[in-house]
């Protein structure tokens, strides 16, 4: 889990807009972030397998 200090720091508006860090809305992870869903890859995968993200299904070919 993400340290609380980093979560609070990410919520605060940065001095410059390029410093903004995208974080997962569910767990607060900064790496592997998917903008379209506001989730990290791990949370996205869990929710997709449960069928909780509309329009997303496992690829098969």
Swiss-Prot record:
SUPFAM superfamilies: Glucocorticoid receptor-like (DNA-binding domain). GO terms for biological process: translation. Binds 1 zinc ion per subunit. InterPro entries: Ribosomal_uS14, Ribosomal_uS14_bact, Ribosomal_uS14_CS, Ribosomal_uS14_sf. PANTHER family: 30S RIBOSOMAL PROTEIN S14 (PTHR19836), SMALL RIBOSOMAL SUBUNIT PROTEIN US14M (PTHR19836:SF19). The keyword DNA repair does not apply. Keywords: Metal-binding, Ribonucleoprotein, Ribosomal protein, RNA-binding, rRNA-binding, Zinc. This is Small ribosomal subunit protein uS14. One of its GO terms (cellular component) is small ribosomal subunit. Gene3D superfamilies: 30s Ribosomal Protein S14, Chain N (4.10.830.10). Its cofactor is Zn(2+).
